[in-house]
Amino acid sequence: MIHVIMGLKGSGKTKKLIASINETVANAHGDVVCIEYGKKLTYDLTYRVRLVDSKEYGINNQDKLKGFLSGLHAGNFDITNVYVDNLYKTIGSDRAAGEAFILWCAEFAQTNDMNFTLSVSDDPAEASEAIKAYLV
């Protein structure tokens, strides 16, 4: 399953993401990973979340993030939930690349029985129909 939290800057996406992560950790039977750009969420999330700073691993486009996520899953089959905060800061603000990545996540999640939640700084009205199906 995949959820996309989309809104313009300052619309409360990160607060929704933090609440979702902490709720998931309280109820999940597997590992939870949060990938962010920078180290802003360190004190907002419970210690049981594996927090990853994408800058530390040189992740700056969708191919690197796909490889990183694939490697995480290959190394730990207990990961049930992956959160990505501020997708466009991590992979760049190309809307087509962002859409392609979201669709890849949907397929990867279904194949590997995982859940993805991504926050995207963009206007939800501008999202394609394929992406609108995942908006929360």
Predicted feature locations:
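Conserved P-loop
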Residues: 1-71, 127-129
